[in-house]
């Protein structure tokens, strides 16, 4: 993201410093010499961070099955509970970002994350404030130490194009980024 905050979570931390170093790859793919970045890839995890008063932008995987307006399998929701509860217990505000289905940058009512709110509240044990990305800043301002769920990020046209402006809008909402959605981490999305 090139974001102004620490990146923590399951997969990768954007390095604070980089320097290009030539590396001899031998005959790999017909390439004899290439340049790679030597980076400080030390891990930062939530349990080692000061979260008190911090807004923790947390990518989660809650792309769950729904029938007749109800979540039918809460497995993915159950998996995010420890992370969300840790943020809350540490005095932080978890701001959840997720996708649901494939709306391709269009608002599709049937793919709104609002349907997941009752299941999230039951699993986490606290109320969840649901908001659009456009109203997220105001919602977060009044949600200290509460859970905020932002509407389906794939409603945003730039999400699947890895739009830097969308990434910056998201980055501006948090002080810390946590990737708790390993299943979506490989995607080059905003």
Question: Each predicted region: which residue ranges?
Answer:
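Intrinsically disordered, low-complexity segments enriched in serine/proline and basic residues
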Residues: 2-18
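Short, positively charged and aromatic/hydrophobic N-terminal segments
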Residues: 6, 13, 24-38
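Active-site loop-to-helix "anion-binding N-cap" substructures in soluble metabolic enzymes
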Residues: 32, 36-190
